Amino acid sequence: MKLRSIFTNSFGILFSRVTGLFRDVLMASALGASVWSDMFFIAFKLPNLFRRIFAEGAFTQAFMPSFVASRHKGVFATAIFLRFLLFLMSISVLITLFPEPITKLMAWGWDAQKIADTAPLTAINFWYLDLIFIVTFLATLLQYRDHFATTAMSTALLNLSMISALYLYMKEDPRSVAYALSFAVLIGGSMQIAAHLVTIRYFRLDKILIGGWKYRKRKDVEEEKKHFHSLFLPGILGNSTPQISAFVDTILATFLMTGSVSYLFYANRVFQLPLAIIAIATATVLFPTVSKALNNGEEERAYQHLNQAFWLLTFLLGAAMLGGILLAEPIVWLLFERGKFTQVQTLDTVVVLQMYMIGLLPFGLSKLFSLFLYASHRHKKAAKIALYSLITSVSSSLVLMQFMGASGLALAGSIGGWVLFLFTVREVGTERFRDIIKSRRSLYYIGFMVSFAILLHFANIWIVHYIRG
């Protein structure tokens, strides 16, 4: 297992997430959990949904094994890039011209005036999807060369752009802040592209793309493109479970009290921090390695990486899950309770965060096990598993929101995460999973979790008493 690469990727993601949390702290101070914060989060939700399931998720996991196996890498890469970019730009133009229908789709529970106020923000923010697709395409080429640092660090550029906008417009009215943030998103995405282009040139990968553009005999890669699409289309569903679930939750939250969309956003941001630093960083590094190993028939080597990564993620994610549940109030207080973000809003966000954290371990381990399905071209199986999880999550949301409000939506997502994990493990191999957990490490893990939970419980009592007096 490439621990150095995992550490580098994790550090880059950590830096990006820390700047993201700082951005969210400023955003909470400037907008609180208000009408305008809800409107910006709705507008920013759609490009982020497509980014995660379309650009970063399904595209990467279909493109990498196809690119590894391709005999005409430059031609294949440029053909896929141009097709996707033209498609995404067409959608962006359509949404720019007709933003209100798509905004209504995301916020069914809002009145016509609120939809009208949010629609221009939706039109601006959606162009970020085009920018981030270019970033994702370039990042996948860099992953092929085992370079992860640029991609991991580049998200900080988006955050820094938004932080600059918040500093400049902090004292302005909420409407001006929301518009400033929307334009800052596009500036940040452009900066991410620039950073990746510099690195692509450094690794001389630009020659592959230029060669592919000049050669352009697409008939040589027709079969490769068909194979890519056969992986990509199921991959959209396979990667979409948490994202579509969160998207549905956002829609359902518009039927709840004002601030519910913001509570979900702030809590999910904290939840995403350990998921990204630990699980996504590890899976990102392992994916090209596992793809190459399986492509070369080295199955045992691939599963050896799985064994090592499983215990690394289980210990780290388990500790983060307990910390997020037991220290939720101090965490939310430290990050968000200032300015227009009140103590009441803190307590509402705390419960949502705790419900999200219940799903941290299964979602993280699902990232690890599912990469074996994608690397071995079993995208349809992954899509079927994701569908089971999505149905469970959405149906649970419809029930739990009646009794628990926004926290019920978060809990439903966690339930879907456990379903995703169990079915993914079964598909990868129940016997292999049993062999992994039969290790003596299981006893150490149980002892560690119990001891750590007791320690955190008493730490939380002391910290809450200190901050609340």
Protein language model features and the residues they cover:
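Membrane-embedded alpha-helical bundles of multi-pass transporters/translocases
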Residues: 1-469
